[in-house]
Amino acid sequence: MGWRFPSPSPRQASPVAPLLAAPTAVRSCSHCSGQREAISSHPLQLETPELGVCLPWHWEGWRQVRKITPSLPQPPGSQVPLEVTFHVRATLPHFRGGETKARRAREEGKLPSLGNAPAPRRRSVAWPAAEGSCAAPESSPPASEASLPAPESSLLVAGSGDLCADSF
């Protein structure tokens, strides 16, 4: 046996009855008669506009709205619904296509087409060659010795006996 929500009257068993007690934002409509209010605590969360219009009938954007048509005069500020009619329309996502910042950046080549952005390229630091103050060795060392640190004697300028100032 399934669950049934309590209904406002015994002849009307409706699953939307708990929504009648939901906190609402009442707006009077300038395009049609009566007042309509958006259900703000429903899972279909509604944006309450600052416009004084009944959006499902005159604009796009609201998904579910209930209409209040009082049959008896009520004091101002009263929110007792005497007759409630639900109007539901299909929902659409907020973004339905068009250009985004990411798509424009991909087209301009600033982002890759898929996946994460590439890692920044590492560049090896190339030191400028000494400009003649330090004498270059006449023969290059063998490949096995090229990766070893140079001894202090290689910092001497040929024939001067002093350390080369550009090598520091």
UniProtKB/Swiss-Prot annotation:
Region: Disordered, residue numbers: 98-152
Low complexity bias (residue ranges): 128-152
Residue ranges with Basic and acidic residues bias: 98-110
Keyword set includes Transit peptide: yes
Gene Ontology CC: mitochondrion
Keywords: Mitochondrion, Transit peptide
Cellular localisation: Mitochondrion
FT transit peptide: 1-29
Full protein name: Putative uncharacterized protein FLJ45275, mitochondrial
